């Protein structure tokens, strides 16, 4: 997979932005399994843009009871200028929550992502996260 230098950040409990790394298309912050996994992708060519959101887990099983509710997502440019904000719905989809600009759609986590050329800084603040 090619990500062309994307940088993604999530604020930790202290409010400090923590850079996330890619792994099989997913990001994991160790060691806390309750930390949120966020996959942000944009596929140039078909206009698909979305956010794939779930709790951290080494496997996709055993996460059904660990939903996060995300109310707002803010995209920032590299200089931290706000680009756009989205208000997200919450959908119970077997532990897999996905928001796209047009509609909900199910994607396999092994989705091959090609031609990703933009660089974003992605923040989710503590107040945007809440457990059910």
Language-model segments: which ranges?
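Intrinsically disordered, low-complexity segments enriched in small/polar residues
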Residues: 1-9, 19-132
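Short solvent-exposed strand-capping/beta-turn motif centered on an Asx-Ser/Thr pair
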Residues: 11-15
């Amino acid at each position: 997979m090619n990500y062309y230098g994307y940088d993604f950040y999530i604020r930790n409990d202290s409010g400090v932005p923590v850079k996330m790394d890619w792994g099989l298309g997913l990001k994991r912050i160790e060691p806390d399994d309750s930390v949120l996994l966020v996959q942000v992708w944009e596929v140039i060519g078909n206009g698909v843009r979305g956010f794939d959101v779930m709790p951290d887990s080494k496997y996709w099983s055993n996460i059904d009871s660990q939903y996060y509710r995300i109310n707002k997502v803010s995209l920032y440019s590299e200089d931290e200028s706000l680009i756009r904000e989205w208000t997200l719905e919450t959908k119970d989809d077997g532990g897999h929550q996905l928001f796209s600009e047009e509609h909900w759609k199910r994607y396999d986590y092994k989705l091959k992502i090609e031609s990703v050329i933009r660089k974003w800084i992605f923040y989710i603040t503590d107040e945007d996260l809440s457990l059910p």
